[in-house]
From Swiss-Prot:
Function noted in UniProt: Produces ATP from ADP in the presence of a proton gradient across the membrane.
Bilayer topology: Peripheral membrane protein
Protein name in the entry: ATP synthase epsilon chain
Pfam families listed in its UniProt record: ATP-synt_DE_N
Transmembrane segment boundaries: none
SUPFAM superfamilies xrefs: Epsilon subunit of F1F0-ATP synthase N-terminal domain (SSF51344)
Family according to the record: Belongs to the ATPase epsilon chain family.
GO molecular function, one term: ATP binding
Length: 135
């Protein structure tokens, strides 16, 4: 049986989850990564995506996050999300609104750097939309 460790998912509004878990899959800035007990220390930014959690009792849970940071230590993991919602509570209109806003930001980009960042963010949102919402 996998060793459990402490995990917390925090948004500006509230603490969404504080529990003993055996595995957390995080949408890191360099791609998805899995945190396990005893993980080497790591701090990374997170991109819009789904945080998947395997609880110590074997149940799984998923949350949609829109950016933030993950702090992983051998003893635990904390995700500080800019915005987070349980996957069952996600509002398709909210994701579409974020996509529409990202398109507007892309259209109004004043430099190549801003345009590139806006394109990446728009792509991340559209990938997220495809991953969690039915076609």
């Amino acid at each position: 049986m996998a060793q459990a460790f402490q995990f917390e998912l925090v948004s500006p509004e509230r603490l969404l989850l504080s529990a003993q878990v055996t595995e957390v899959v995080i949408p890191g800035s360099e791609g998805y990564l899995t945190a396990l007990a005893g993980h080497s220390p790591l701090m990374t930014t997170i991109m819009p995506g789904v945080v998947s959690v395997k609880l110590a009792d074997g149940k799984t849970d998923s949350y949609v996050v829109f950016g933030g940071f993950a702090d992983i230590t051998p003893q635990g993991c904390t995700v500080l999300a800019e915005s987070a919602t349980h996957v069952d509570d996600i509002d398709p209109a909210d994701i579409q609104h974020r996509i529409d806003h990202a398109r507007k930001v892309l259209e109004d980009a004043s430099s190549n750097e801003h345009r590139t960042k806006a394109e990446i963010f728009l792509h991340q949102l559209m990938t997220l939309q495809g991953a969690i919402l039915p076609a």
